[in-house]
Swiss-Prot record:
Alpha-D-glucose 1-phosphate binds at Y112, G177, E192, K193, S210. Keywords: ATP-binding, Carbohydrate metabolism, Glycogen biosynthesis, Glycogen metabolism, Nucleotide-binding, Nucleotidyltransferase, Transferase. GO terms for biological process: glycogen biosynthetic process. Belongs to the bacterial/plant glucose-1-phosphate adenylyltransferase family. It catalyses: alpha-D-glucose 1-phosphate + ATP + H(+) = ADP-alpha-D-glucose + diphosphate. It comes from the Bacteria. It comes from Rhodospirillum rubrum (strain ATCC 11170 / ATH 1.1.1 / DSM 467 / LMG 4362 / NCIMB 8255 / S1). Its EC number is 2.7.7.27. This is Glucose-1-phosphate adenylyltransferase.
Length: 423
C-alpha cells in the first residue's frame, strides 16, 4: 500500500474519531430585533435555511457525523429546528447530532462565561464520546468548508491545535482576532482585534483573521481548559485567552481557509461571511439573487441540509399591464403567492403573500409575510410574520422610516411586527 493511500485511510479513521462542537449560544445583539425571539444561529437565511445549517452541513459533507450543539440564549427555536431537520443520522452506527443546553454542570453558579467555558462545562459529556480530536465551530457564520482537509493539515503538521484563518485586507482586520505567522504558518502571536494587524508573510497588505474554528488534540484540550478554569483573571474565551496563552508553548498552526474552502463554480475567492449586523445579513441574502452568487446553494456535491417543510410550489397569478404577478432577479421560496404584485431583486422565504399592485425591490422577507395592496418596499428586511398594511411605503423616505423603524447606516430598513403594530 503506497504512502498516499495509507495517509488517506488514517484521515478516514480520524474523521470517525473527531467530535464536532458547534457553539450556538450567542445572542447576536447586533442583529437587533431579528434575535429578540431566537439566537443568532437560529436566524433564517437564504430562503429556506437557518444559519446553524451551514456548519452542520459542512460536518455532514466532510464525513464528520458526530456533532454536538451547545446552546444557551433563547434556544427553543434552534432546538426545535435541529430535532425536526437533523434526525436522519443513524445513531446505531455512531452518527448523531446531540443538543447540549446550558446546565451549569460545574460548581459555578453562572451560565457560560465565554466560548472556552462553554466547552469546559461540558467536558464530562465530551469525554463520554472518547474523541481523538475535537473540532470547535462557531454556529453563526455562512461558509462552505471541507473539514476533512483541515483535519488532514492538522495531522500532517503534528499540531496540538490548528486555527482556521481567512485572509482579509489589513484595514478590515481590526474587528477580528488576528494571527501572526512565520513562513511555515506556525502561529507566533494571536491578537484580539488589534489596532495594527500583522501582515501575512509575502503579502503585507493582507492579514490572517481567525474564523473561530479550531481543531484540538483531545487530551491537549482537556489539559488547557482545566488550567484556564482555575485562572480567575481569564475571560475563558478561546480567542482572548486559550490560544494566546499557548502560543510559544504548544504547537499552534494556522490553516489557510483557501486550502479547504468549497468554492462556487467559476470562483476562486473563498466565501466566509459573519452576518452579525443587519447590513451584513441583508447583503449576504441579497447576493444570492445574482446570476452567479459568491455562495452557490445549487451545488449538489455539497448540499446544505435543513428541515424541509411540506409546502406547495410558489405561484404567480394575474397578467394584465397594471396587475401582473411577477418576479425577476429574485429567489421565491415554496408556499409563496405573488398575486398581481411585482418582486425585483428580492429574496422571499416560505409562505409570503405579495398582493396586487404592490412593489417589492431589493428586499428580504422572512417567512409568513403579507404585503398589502399598493404597498411599496425598497431595501428592507421584514421579520417573520410581518403584515404590511395596504398602501404603506417603506424605503423611499429615510427620515420618515427612521421615526417608525430601525434604519442602518447603509439605508436598510428593518421592519418587525412589533414596530408595525405601533403605526
Amino acid at each position: 500500500m503506497d504512502q498516499i493511500t495509507e495517509f488517506q485511510l488514517d484521515i478516514n479513521r480520524a474523521l470517525k474519531e473527531t467530535l464536532a462542537l458547534v457553539l450556538a449560544g450567542g445572542r447576536g445583539s447586533r442583529l437587533r430585533d431579528l434575535t429578540n425571539r431566537e439566537s443568532k444561529p437560529a436566524v433564517p437565511f437564504g430562503g429556506k435555511y437557518r444559519i446553524i445549517d451551514f456548519p452542520l452541513s459542512n460536518c455532514m459533507n466532510s464525513g464528520i457525523r458526530r456533532m454536538c450543539v451547545i446552546t444557551q440564549y433563547r434556544a427553543h427555536t434552534l432546538i426545535h429546528h435541529i430535532q425536526r431537520g437533523w434526525g436522519f443520522l443513524r445513531a446505531e452506527i455512531g452518527e448523531f447530532v446531540e443538543l447540549w443546553p446550558a446546565q451549569q454542570q460545574t460548581d459555578k453558579e453562572s451560565w457560560y462565561l465565554g466560548t472556552a467555558d462553554a466547552v469546559h462545562q461540558n467536558l464530562d459529556l465530551i469525554r463520554m464520546h472518547d474523541p481523538r480530536f475535537v473540532l470547535i465551530l462557531a454556529g453563526d457564520h455562512i461558509y462552505k468548508q471541507d473539514y476533512s482537509k483541515l483535519l488532514a493539515h492538522h495531522i500532517a503538521r503534528g499540531s496540538d491545535c490548528t486555527v482556521a484563518c481567512v485572509d482579509v485586507p489589513r484595514e478590515e482586520a481590526t474587528g477580528y482576532g488576528c494571527v501572526e505567522v512565520d513562513n511555515d504558518d506556525n502561529i507566533v502571536h494571536f491578537l484580539e482585534k488589534p489596532a495594527n494587524p500583522p501582515g501575512i508573510p509575502g503579502r503585507p497588505d493582507r492579514a490572517f483573521a481567525s474564523m473561530g474554528i479550531y481543531i484540538f488534540n483531545a487530551d491537549f484540550l482537556y489539559e488547557i481548559l482545566e488550567s484556564d478554569a482555575l485562572n480567575e483573571a481569564s475571560q475563558h474565551d478561546f480567542g482572548r485567552d486559550i490560544i494566546p496563552s499557548q502560543v510559544g508553548k504548544a504547537r499552534i498552526v494556522a490553516h489557510r481557509f483557501s486550502q479547504s474552502c468549497v468554492y462556487s463554480v467559476g470562483r476562486r475567492e473563498p466565501y466566509w461571511r459573519d452576518v452579525g449586523t443587519v447590513d451584513a445579513y441583508w447583503s449576504a441574502n441579497i447576493d444570492l439573487v445574482s446570476v452567479t452568487p459568491a455562495l452557490d446553494l445549487y451545488d449538489a456535491d455539497w448540499p446544505i441540509w435543513t428541515y424541509q417543510m411540506q409546502r406547495p410550489p410558489a405561484k404567480f397569478v394575474f397578467d394584465t399591464d397594471e396587475r401582473r404577478g411577477m418576479a425577476k432577479d429574485s429567489l421565491v421560496s415554496a408556499g409563496c403567492i405573488v398575486s398581481g404584485g411585482a418582486v425585483t431583486g428580492s429574496l422571499l422565504f416560505n409562505d409570503v403573500r405579495v398582493n396586487s399592485y404592490s412593489s417589492v425591490i431589493d428586499t428580504v422577507i422572512l417567512p409568513m409575510g403579507d404585503i398589502g395592496r399598493h404597498a411599496r418596499l425598497t431595501k428592507c428586511i421584514l421579520d417573520t410574520g410581518c403584515r404590511i398594511p395596504e398602501g404603506l411605503v417603506i424605503g423611499e423616505d429615510p427620515i420618515l422610516d427612521a421615526k417608525r423603524f430601525h434604519v442602518t447606516e447603509q439605508g436598510i430598513t428593518l421592519v418587525t411586527p412589533d414596530r408595525l403594530a405601533l403605526l
